[in-house]
């Protein structure tokens, strides 16, 4: 995918295509996803109504920008607290081969299954809490807007293979969350600017281990 800056405002499908260089087929799958989101949202509140007219930027582009941060050869991605599918389901549509979406709300999980069915995305939905769900060892774990880093890391550690990485988009609290998390965890931290949230940061964490334990 190319890495041009996002145009604004009124960011639409054509802008998404220009920004990420995706194929016509991928764009069509995302358009089908958007249509389902609009259809289901009034009944089950998948995303804030105020963001529905801005899905291509606030949700699709915000998720898609993580694709370029995945290590080469990433096969299995586990997305925690997927909600309406951000970022995990977008990353499956963009080409991650095996994505596991973990979402404890049964109605949201049903929506995720329907989007995966309609778009053919390689996503398996687990209608369970992340504390209980099982998935194959993950090359990468993602989560957006689920929890503070100190709560996220033990959840992510349940799924990560040795040497796996975490991708967490964070808002302006990123630095404070990192400081607190470092009390209990050692990790390599890389921070990238968010292309959709000027006050946010994309955290890529690797070499993650509880303090006092050797890295696997
Ligand atoms: C604030 S929403 C964020 C959804 C999505 N990641 C996004 O950014 O749009 C958090 C989601 O996580 C789910 N959730 C909360 N705790 C969870 C847990 N322990 N395991 C799995 N899902 C959980 C909620 O049902 C909700 O859909």
Swiss-Prot record:
One of its GO terms (cellular component) is cytosol. It is found in: Cytoplasm. It is an enzyme of class 2 (transferase). It holds the Pfam family GidB. It comes from the Bacteria. Disulfide bonds: none annotated. Its EC number is 2.1.1.170. S-adenosyl-L-methionine binds at residues 81, 86, 130-131, 144. It catalyses: guanosine(527) in 16S rRNA + S-adenosyl-L-methionine = N(7)-methylguanosine(527) in 16S rRNA + S-adenosyl-L-homocysteine. InterPro entries: rRNA_ssu_MeTfrase_G, SAM-dependent_MTases_sf. Keywords: Cytoplasm, Methyltransferase, rRNA processing, S-adenosyl-L-methionine, Transferase. GO terms for molecular function: rRNA (guanine-N7-)-methyltransferase activity. Specifically methylates the N7 position of guanine in position 527 of 16S rRNA. PANTHER family: S-ADENOSYL-L-METHIONINE-DEPENDENT METHYLTRANSFERASES SUPERFAMILY PROTEIN. Belongs to the methyltransferase superfamily. RNA methyltransferase RsmG family. This is Ribosomal RNA small subunit methyltransferase G. It comes from Rhodospirillum centenum (strain ATCC 51521 / SW).
